[in-house]
């Protein structure tokens, strides 16, 4: 059970990229027990990213139909959504903004969409409100995860809110001096040729993300 099976590289946004060693058994185990669903899912995120692997493993565990774009231009993605009646689109706020700017959503029928999930970067409140205007029947869900700890289950306060709860049975969270700390069953075994300085001795990962807490338990990252 304690064998490495996956190496992901960090983005290197705060220094040299780090090679992160994951236990693949633990990652795969977190997707067990999911029910089959008759949905069409567009695979948007790349597989060198924890979010892309999350999309792939989720789809395989539920036996859903996957659509793979040749590239990620808004026009092409919108065309695929119309052609294959895509139900779920995972994307970044930047890409969703490009869809609106390009008006690809006006040239193609995207009414099959039931859910748009977003993450990897902050979602501006103003953009989320615009998206809800153009996609009023779509549920918007904010996702959260890190390459070090994996993707956690989340619940958005509402489709037009950027507040969320991390309510994953495999994930613990706490807020220390305004910073989000995470401890999960799917976190890395270690780094190649690099220290674990962002982890505490008892396994908490210091994400570096500052959060705003609401009185009802939701947080804004």
What do the PLM-derived regions correspond to, one by one?
Residues 161-167, 201-203:
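Short Gly/Pro-enriched turn/cap motifs at secondary-structure boundaries
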Residues 13, 63, 120, 145, ...:
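Conserved G/P- and acidic residue-centered "switch" motifs that form tight phosphate/ATP-binding loops
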Residues 73, 94-96, 123, 187:
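Alpha-helix capping/helix-boundary segments
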Residues 88-90, 103-161:
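Gly/Ser/Thr-rich phosphate-binding loop
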Residues 4-32:
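Conserved AMP-binding A3 loop
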Residues 181-221:
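Conserved ATP-binding/catalytic segment of the ANL
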Residues 28-40, 48-88:
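Conserved AMP-binding/adenylation subdomain of ANL enzymes
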């Amino acid at each position: 059970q304690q064998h490495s099976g996956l190496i992901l590289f960090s983005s290197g946004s705060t220094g040299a990229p780090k090679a992160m060693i994951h236990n693949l058994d633990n990652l795969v185990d977190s997707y067990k027990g999911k029910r089959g669903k008759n949905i069409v899912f567009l695979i948007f995120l790349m597989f060198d990213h924890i979010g892309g692997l999350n999309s792939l493993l989720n789809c395989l565990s539920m036996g859903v139909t996957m659509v793979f774009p040749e590239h990620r231009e808004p026009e092409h993605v919108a065309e695929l959504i119309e052609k294959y009646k895509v139900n779920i689109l995972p994307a970044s706020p930047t890409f969703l903004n490009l869809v609106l700017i390009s008006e690809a959503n006006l040239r193609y029928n995207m009414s099959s969409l039931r859910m748009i999930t977003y993450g990897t970067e902050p979602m501006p409140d103003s953009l989320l409100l615009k998206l809800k205007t153009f996609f009023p029947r779509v549920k918007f869900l904010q996702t959260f995860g890190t390459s070090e700890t994996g993707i956690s289950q989340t619940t958005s306060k509402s489709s037009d809110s950027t507040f969320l709860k991390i309510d994953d049975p495999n994930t613990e969270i706490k807020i220390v001096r305004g910073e989000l700390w995470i401890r999960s069953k799917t976190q890395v075994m270690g780094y190649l040729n690099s220290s674990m300085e962002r982890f505490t001795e008892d396994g908490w990962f210091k994400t570096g993300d500052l959060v705003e807490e609401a009185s009802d338990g939701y947080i804004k990252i």
